[in-house]
Amino acid sequence: MDRTAAQNARESLDLAFSISNFLQTGLDRHTLSILIALCEHGVNPEALAAVVKELRREAAALHQHQDQS
């Protein structure tokens, strides 16, 4: 990747991360970059959103179960 392309990619990720924070998605920069890359490779964004939501539900349930134990 040349310098200009790398700079453009970085700026795009910065913008996406700012929007993500504004929308209070709770996604960190690394996770967001993975999700963007998956979308760029043809993965359905709605399916990814559903997976993220399900993983969050499962993690919350696991934490709740651990707190009760």
Curated annotation (Swiss-Prot):
Keyword set includes Cytoplasm: yes
Subcellular locations according to the entry: Cytoplasm, Cytoskeleton, Microtubule organizing center; Cytoplasm, Cytoskeleton, Spindle
Keywords annotated in UniProt: Cytoplasm, Cytoskeleton
Primary localization: cytoplasm
Domain of life: Eukaryota
GO biological process, alphabetically ordered: gamma-tubulin complex localization; microtubule nucleation by interphase microtubule organizing center; mitotic spindle assembly
Coiled coil regions, renumbered to chain: none
GO cellular component, one term: spindle
Cytoplasm recorded as keyword: yes
InterPro entries: MZT1
Annotated function: Required for gamma-tubulin complex recruitment to the microtubule organizing centers (MTOCs).
Subunit structure: Part of the gamma-tubulin complex.
Recorded family membership: Belongs to the MOZART1 family.
Protein name: Mitotic-spindle organizing protein 1
